[in-house]
């Protein structure tokens, strides 16, 4: 392995499930450990933990899952500020403030942006839907509230003893703004962590051109509690990379006839800038952004398996930036 990571990584990988977001992050954790000997911390809110199991078993990373912890806003803000589980092996261990040990942490992976926003919006204690279920009004909208009991048709109130009385809530429009603004703040807070590498992952979402005051075309970007931030959340990160699987034809040997036949397979691509669907059948723009590179920087990096292209991306990124720097320092001959 050759060294290829920049001095600072603060990037977002987004795409549909199975396109390689977590695989990219896992390979970066491996690369970081190879280059620096430092371990990484994984902040997990979905089922992606299994992707990192070999890193956990090897002691190269440790993980904290947040999706069942109460008070989502407080939990996420603390994790983005360097708080960590007192005992990472205990899924219910309390979070404690950072100590000097944090300086030995080389990287953070937040899995991820979309599930963290859904966690804020959700029904766990402290989540916005939970608050609505308790009757708490946030903003101009009335709380969406469901109580598991029979309702008195005259008063509209639950009949005592007619059901368990469990309260559930939903999300009125005001909740989306609260979740979006706080997620941006949490992402920005994480940038201050004293680690060389900070990576966020996200799922895909498509914007709503009819309601978007600035972007009047269909845009696919990272999902953050609704659609308002889909077209511009990438401005928070250094690089925003889109992962997509694309159908391709390959020649294989038929097991029964022994003949060479065409078969459909998948090419896994890591897109570095805005692009359209590879099939050419959809006029939808997928957001991507790589900063500080030459004009001839590749539009995408292909691989045969999810996540394999990520180190190629960072290696070419380093070469491209070195070329730009050299062009500035090399005198131009006069004619």
Model-derived regions: residue spans:
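A structural signal for short, well-ordered beta-strand segments and their strand-loop junctions
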Residues: 42-44, 107-111, 197-202, 240-242
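A general structural signal for short secondary-structure junctions and capping/turn motifs
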Residues: 3, 28, 98-101, 189-192, ...
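Phosphate-binding/switch region of NTP-binding enzymes
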Residues: 198-295
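P-loop NTPase motor core
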Residues: 112-231
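Conserved P-loop
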Residues: 2-119
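Short glycine-/polar-rich loops that comprise or flank the Walker A/P-loop
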Residues: 36-39, 193-196, 235-239
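Surface-exposed intrinsically disordered loops and tails
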Residues: 85-98, 142-159, 253-256, 291-297
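C-terminal regions of RecA-like/P-loop NTPase motor modules
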Residues: 3-11, 255-335
């Amino acid at each position: 392995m050759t060294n290829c990571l920049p001095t600072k990584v603060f990037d977002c990988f987004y795409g549909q499930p199975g396109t390689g977001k977590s695989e990219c992050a896992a390979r970066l954790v491996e690369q970081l450990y190879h280059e620096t000997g430092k371990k990484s911390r994984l902040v997990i809110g979905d089922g992606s933990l299994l992707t990192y199991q070999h890193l956990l078993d090897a002691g190269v990373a440790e993980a904290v899952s947040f999706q069942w912890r109460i008070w989502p806003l407080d939990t996420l803000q603390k994790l983005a500020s360097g708080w960590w589980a007192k005992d990472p092996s205990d899924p219910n261990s309390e979070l404690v403030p950072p100590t000097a040990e944090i300086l030995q942490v080389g990287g953070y992976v937040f899995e991820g942006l979309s599930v963290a926003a859904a966690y804020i919006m959700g029904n766990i204690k402290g989540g916005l839907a939970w608050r609505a279920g308790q009757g708490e009004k946030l903003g101009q909208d009335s709380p969406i509230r469901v109580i598991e009991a029979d309702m008195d048709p005259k008063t509209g109130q639950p009949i005592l003893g007619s059901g368990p009385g469990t309260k559930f809530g939903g999300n009125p429009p005001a909740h989306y703004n609260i979740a979006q603004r706080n997620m941006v703040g949490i992402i920005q807070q994480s940038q201050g962590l004293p680690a060389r590498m900070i990576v966020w992952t996200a799922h895909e979402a498509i914007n709503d051109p009819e309601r978007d005051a600035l972007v009047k075309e269909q845009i696919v970007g990272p999902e953050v509690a609704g659609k308002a931030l889909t077209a511009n959340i990438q401005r928070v990160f250094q690089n925003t990379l889109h992962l997509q699987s694309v159908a391709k034809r390959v020649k294989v040997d038929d097991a029964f006839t022994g003949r060479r036949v065409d078969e459909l397979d998948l090419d896994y691509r890591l897109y570095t800038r805005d692009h359209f669907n590879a099939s050419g059948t959809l006029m939808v723009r997928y957001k991507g952004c790589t900063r500080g590179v030459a004009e001839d920087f590749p539009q995408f990096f292909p691989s045969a398996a999810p996540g394999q292209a990520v180190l190629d991306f960072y290696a070419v990124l380093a070469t491209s930036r070195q070329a730009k720097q050299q062009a500035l320092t090399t005198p131009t001959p006069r004619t």
